[in-house]
Amino acid sequence: MAKIKDDCIELELTPRRYQELDDDPFILSVFELLENKKAVVRDFSAVLLESEYKVLISGIETMIKGNQDSISLETIEPFLFLSIDQENGNYRIKIKIIFDDYKESKSNSNLFEINCNEEKLESFVTALKLNLENTKNPSKLP
């Protein structure tokens, strides 16, 4: 599981598959966001495109190499905007989550920020890359 956190906010993003259709571009995922160790979002059925993972991974790797100052990603399920900015060797991850309130026919959004150093970001992207590779050959359930 790929986790990154600072003193207040923790993000976990883990691609997983129990069965795979070869032509299915979606990856069932775990998306969890904690604030002060309390769940803000805990979605065990998040669905992200494989291309979204690849854009995120390659963008972070490019930032770490110093060839890019920022990246952004917008996902559908859950509906969120994720951006990472780099300044003076420090990284700021912004996560904006859109919540739909079907009872009142409106949307609410919350913005969360994680501040980290290069080592934490590199650990996150390494774990995310490994998790994505492991979805290609999922373990068989009994």
UniProtKB/Swiss-Prot annotation:
Q: Where does the source fall among the domains of life?
A: Bacteria
Biological role = Immunity protein component of a toxin-immunity protein module, which functions as a cellular contact-dependent growth inhibition (CDI) system. Neutralizes the tRNase activity of cognate toxin WapA upon expression in E.coli. Does not inhibit WapA from other strains of B.subtilis. The WapA C-terminus cannot be expressed on its own in E.coli, however it can be cloned in the presence of its cognate immunity protein gene. Cell contact is necessary for growth inhibition. Unlike the LXG toxin-immunity modules, WapAI mediates competition under shaking culture conditions.
Q: Which organism is it from?
A: Bacillus subtilis (strain 168)
Q: Which residues form a coiled coil?
A: none
Q: What happens when the gene is disrupted?
A: A double wapA-wapI deletion strain is growth inhibited when cocultured with wild-type cells. When wapI is reintroduced it restores growth in a cognate toxin-dependent fashion. Growth inhibition by wild-type cells is strongest on LB medium and less effective on media that promote biofilm formation (MSgg and 2xSGG).
What is the protein's name according to its record?
Immunity protein WapI
Which residues, if any, are the signal sequence?
A: none
Induction or repression: Constitutively and highly expressed on solid and in liquid medium, with or without biofilm formation by 12 hours of culture. Repressed by DegU.
